[in-house]
Each structure stands twice: as C-alpha cells, then as structure tokens.
A protein has these predicted regions:
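The feature marks proteins involved in alpha-glucan
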Residues: 1-45, 75-154, 159-166, 173, ...
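Short proline/glycine-enriched turn/loop motifs at strand-loop junctions of beta-rich domains
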Residues: 49-56, 573-576
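C-terminal accessory region downstream of the catalytic core in glycan-modifying enzymes
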Residues: 503-504, 510-512, 570-601
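Conserved alpha/beta catalytic core and glycan-binding cleft of carbohydrate-active enzymes
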Residues: 118-119, 304-306, 324-489, 494, ...
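Conserved, mostly hydrophobic/aromatic
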Residues: 48, 96, 155, 182, ...
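C-terminal beta-strand-rich structural cap/linker in extracellular carbohydrate-active enzymes
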Residues: 90-94, 597-631
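Substrate-binding/active-site clefts of carbohydrate-active enzymes
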Residues: 116, 137-149, 156-337, 600
C-alpha cells in the first residue's frame, strides 16, 4: 500500500488525486479551461467533474454546438472528463453537453474564469494571469485589524450609481468614482455584495452559478483586479461577499450537474432550501470541498481581496434551518447541527489562514452558535470576525419605538454588553435592513423630518462608540429615505437639500473621529475598553459610558434618546477639564445648537457615583463625545 501511495503522489495526476481527496485547494489551476501550447500550436485543455454522466462533450461556436464533435475522455473513475481543443481564442464561448440516461443538458463550466453577461449563460475562455499589480506596499503592510479601525461601506455595484441610460458603471469607472467617494467619507474598508456570476439580478448576487467568474456585467476579471489595485493604492481594503451555502436551480448551473445530485446533497432532508428555492452544497463530498475552498483561495489570490464575508452561515450550521418538523433529521448525535458543514467551515478557515494569515474571514451568523471567531484548535469555527445580528436587531427595534415608550425597551440598548466580548464582532447596518418594507435607516426613526435627522445622528454616535467594528450600507451616510432598490441607483440628488448634506458632513466627522481615536477601536474584547457611567437612566432614555485605549486614554459618551430636553444635566466624571469633540446637536449638522461651550471643568458636585461632574444642556435626541484634556 505504501508503494502504491508513493506512486500516486509522484504521478503527474497529483492535482486530480488531491481533487478527489478534497485537498486540492488550487483546483482551478487544473479543472476548467486552460490555454497551453502543444506541438507548437495553441491548445485549450478542458476538464470537468461529472461523475454520473454517461458522456460529456465540449460545445461552442467552434464546433457548431454539436455534442458529437468534441467528446471528452473520462480520466478518473470518480468522473473527471478531459478534452483538448486547438485553434480557440480568448473570449470564445463554450459549454459542456452533459448526457445522463439519454438526456443532454448544456452546462456552464463550474471553473470558468469568465462568463457571458446575463441573460447569456455560456462560459468564456479567459487568461486569468498577466495583470501587473501596483499594490505591493499595501500588501506588505497589511495586518489583521483586531486593534485597528474597521469602518466598512457596504455596496451593491449594480445600484450605487447608474448611467443616465440605465447601464452599469464598469469596474474601472467605479475605481474612479466609488473609491474616491468612499475615501472622502473616511471609511477604511469597502464590502462588495456578491459578484461571482449570477443569472438573476433580483437575487442581489446571492444565487451564483460561477464561483470563479466575476460578473461580466461590470467588465472583465482584469478590470476588477484594477478596481482592487486602485483601492489598495488609496489605502482601502476590499471584502467580497461569498456564498458557499447554497446555489440556484438554473439549468445551466451547478444544479444536478451530471443529471443527478452532484454538487448538492442527495438526501431529501438536506438538499434544498425550499424557502429560497435553492440547492444546498454537499459539504461532506470531497470534490465539493476542493471546489469551494479553491473558489475562496482563487478570489483572495488572483484578485488580492482582503477578505470574504461568508453568507448565510446559520443555514449551514443547522439541519432544521428553515425547515418544519418532519422536514429534517437529526445528526448521529441526535442534534440539529450539520456536522459536515461545521467540519467544512473549520477546514475552510484553516486553509485560508495558512496561506493568508491576515485575511478577514467574516461570518454572517445570526444565532448564538458559540465560538464562531475562536481558532479551530480551541474548538471554534475559525473565523476572525462575525456580524453582531443580536445587537442590530435590538437597537433597530429600540430606535423604531416611539420615544415616549422607549423606557420600557431600555434593555435593548444595554443587553448587547452582556455578550459584546464573546466574539470579534462587526456591528452591521446592512442592505438587509433597508428593503422589503423595513424602511430606510432614517425612515425607521419616529417623528417629523427634523426629529428623524436628530435621531439618526444620535444613533450613529451610539453605534460608533459601541464595542465592535462598523458596517453601514450605501445610502445610510446621507439619509436616503427611499428603501434600497437594486434596479435603481442611489438618490444622490438628495444632497442638494441642506439636511441631507449636513448629515453627510456629520457622518464624515464621525468617521474621522472613529478612525483617529484609538479608544474607540483598540480594545474590543474585554471590559478594559468599556465602562458604564450610567446604564440605567431608563426613565430619561439616557445612557453614558466611556471607551479606553491601551494607553489609558478615554472618550466619554452620553446619548439622550428621549424627546425631552434636559437643562443643566450633570455627568459624573473624574476631576479635570473635558473638551467636547462631537456634538450631534450642532447647527452645522442640522441641530438646534442648544449645547453651549466646548470646554467643561468639573466641579465638586457628585453624579453617577463620582464626586465630581460637569454640567451642560442635553437636548432631545443628542449625542456628545468628550475627551479629557487636563487633570
């Protein structure tokens, strides 16, 4: 057995062997379509996995889409087929004609590097190598930002802006327009909603069919490389949404690829998310592991992405996710956990961090599943960040409540601190919160226009001073009232109105305060970085606290979420002089200007358990940040 194993390892078919073992993490270099030279001629080698197919052919314009002309040869007993075709050119279109039990279906190449723009469904030949990068300094200096500012601008490339004729901005146009805008606003990261090729615009990219082909709606793969290259040169990190949880049932895609359940589970209790109308990957299958992990590695390697946000992790973890009683079966331990998915996620993160130690692997996980961001050798899933969905649901529920009744829901403001240090959290106000009748962020705020703007300013100050990294969806920055609509660009014309322009300026100020104030981001994992001043003023709808950095410097925060003005409010602080560095009530931001003064000296009058305090007016829906300038 040892001799046979050695022969296999030394064989030229090592990539094929590893692919079937679930350990070929660069399988895109072997599978798919690759240009090469044979006997002095240009040749393309095609390889595809279709284990239960009776036959597979390569078809395209080059052979009149005739499945009898370029029949592929089975080169492994586990179902990899291969063919060599001469005389093809880059951008030529092709598919695989996969036949099972007399039925032939034309399939896009799962490993294609490029694809036709929908509604076209064919794959395109593409030379993925050759882009000359200019981001070496950025890559060299990259670190994992546990103690650094992370402020993410989440964007849908197809609907940030559109041309007057309704056409998309290209990757190269977005590199000029979008990136400069994001930099101007003071963000540190940009997160792009999924752009692995997807057929249905209404899926927002979350139902993709080509895990190695960046959407051609916006240009070529090298155009996207240019986008990321420019982002890095401007100091901006790029995260991409990635969906290893499920895929759509489009006939040309992964769905029953070889005429049977190939990439998806065969088990009727596992194979489909009926709520979404999609198929579920079989993460226990070795070839699926090679496929998905290779996709993640490909995106990080070839495009220099700084991280992946893994979508719908909860749907992977639980066998009963979205399923009623009788629609799922427990695992071998009698639990509702999908052990294969858990093992896959751990393996994914181990492989990623072995090659890209400073990558961001962000889990969108909406339950209280433990240790999502703990290392796998300590029993965790191995991600390094997780969206804090509990915080998001609680605080949005709180701010949507009429201020008169907020005292009854005060715990929603404070409960998150009971678990804030259990994981490495990102606080997400994402696209999911501004669609489907949920209203835009500013329109969630009760009251008239003036009060809506006042409350969103206070809310943002709360978010940026709460432990956890930050994420906001496009349009939140200037208070778009219309819900996000993937068919249309953002309403930037709203910036002609003073209140929207002032809100944008306020958020720029807030972003820059966050980015330049270590106490707001250095210590996110313990009480050393956060202390309450007064968590329980529920009758007043007021909270106060301070954040501290590793050098002992602090920023002091007080927020009034009530509709009442508090005159001569006292905030208990240590003896000293304090400077007001953020006032959400300032006239320049659209407020009433009721907070007078910029410097405040404590007097010997107790408040909040301190012997000393400062005094100021605290108007309704107002947030204030102070720093200590003198003892």
């Amino acid at each position: 057995m040892q001799k046979k194993s050695k022969q296999i390892i030394n064989n030229e078919n090592l990539p094929l062997y590893l692919f079937h073992q679930g350990t070929n993490y660069n399988s895109y270099e072997y599978m798919g379509a690759h240009f090469c030279a044979k006997n002095g001629e240009n040749c393309v080698v095609f390889r595809v996995w279709a284990p239960n197919a009776d036959s597979v052919s390569v078809v395209g314009d080059f052979n009149g889409w005739d499945k009898t002309k370029t029949v592929m040869k089975r080169i492994s007993i586990n179902g990899v087929f291969e063919a060599e075709v001469f005389g093809l050119n880059e951008y030529d279109v092709y598919k695989y004609a996969v036949t099972n039990n007399g039925k032939t279906v034309l399939k896009a190449d799962p490993y294609a590097f490029h694809a036709e723009t929908p509604p076209g469904t064919a794959s395109k030949l593409y030379k993925i190598d050759g882009y000359i990068w200019n981001d070496q300094d950025f890559i060299y200096n990259k670190t994992t930002p546990y103690d650094k500012p992370v402020n993410v601008y989440e964007v849908n490339l197809g609907s940030w802006k559109k041309h007057k004729d309704g056409s998309y901005y290209t990757y190269r146009e977005l590199a000029d327009k979008l990136l400069d805008y994001v930099i101007k606003l003071g963000y540190t990261h940009i997160e792009i909603m999924p752009i692995c090729e997807f057929p249905f615009d209404g899926s927002w990219g979350y139902q993709c069919v080509s895990y190695f082909a960046i959407s051609s709606r916006f240009g070529t793969p090298k155009d996207f490389m240019y986008f990321i290259d420019v982002a890095h040169q401007k100091g901006l990190s790029v995260i991409l949404d990635w969906v290893p949880s499920h895929f759509p049932k489009d006939e040309h895609g992964l769905y029953e690829f070889d005429g049977t359940c190939c990439y998806e589970y065969k088990d009727e209790f596992k194979k489909e998310h009926k709520e979404w109308g999609t198929r579920v990957f079989d993460w226990g299958k070795c070839e699926v592991q090679s496929f998905l992990i290779s996709s993640a590695m490909f995106l990080l390697e070839k495009f220099h992405l700084d991280g992946l946000r893994v979508d719908a992790v909860s749907s992977m973890l639980y066998l009963d996710y979205g399923r009623k009683d009788g629609e799922w079966l427990p695992n071998s331990n009698g639990e509702n956990l999908n052990l294969e998915a858990i093992a896959f996620l751990k393996k994914l993160n181990e492989v990623i961090f072995a090659r890209f130690p400073n990558a961001l692997m962000v889990a969108e996980e909406s339950t209280s599943y433990p240790m999502v961001t703990k290392p796998t050798d300590k029993g965790g899933l191995g991600f390094n960040f997780k969206w804090n969905m509990g915080w998001m649901n609680d605080v949005l529920s709180y701010v949507e409540c009429d201020p008169y009744f907020r005292s009854k829901t005060h715990d929603k403001l404070t409960f998150s601190l009971f678990y804030a240090f259990n994981e490495n959290f990102i606080l997400p106000i994402s696209h999911d919160e501004v669609v489907h009748g949920k209203k835009s962020l500013i329109d969630k705020m009760p009251g008239d226009i003036y009060n809506k703007f006042s409350q969103i300013r206070a809310f943002n100050a709360y978010m940026f001073s709460h432990p956890g990294k930050k994420l906001n969806f496009m349009g939140n920055e200037y208070g778009q009232f219309r819900e996000w609509d993937y068919k249309n660009g953002l309403e930037f014309f709203m910036l002609k109105f003073p209140m929207h322009k002032k809100l944008l300026n306020y958020n720029i100020t807030l972003n820059n305060i966050y980015k330049n104030t270590p106490s707001l981001y250095e210590i996110e994992d313990s009480w050393e970085g956060f202390k309450w001043i007064s968590p329980d003023e529920r009758d007043n709808n007021v909270i106060s606290y301070y954040r501290t950095d590793t050098n002992g410097n602090s920023i002091y925060v007080i927020i009034n979420f009530s509709g009442n003005d508090y005159i001569d409010y006292r905030l208990g602080l240590e003896k000293g002089t304090y400077k007001l560095i953020l006032n959400s009530n300032a006239k320049k931001y659209g407020g009433s200007g009721q907070v007078k003064g910029k410097t405040f000296r404590t007097i010997r009058k107790s408040a909040h358990g301190n012997k000393n305090s400062i005094k100021f007016n605290l108007p309704k829906f107002t947030a204030l940040y102070f720093i200590k300038t003198q003892n």
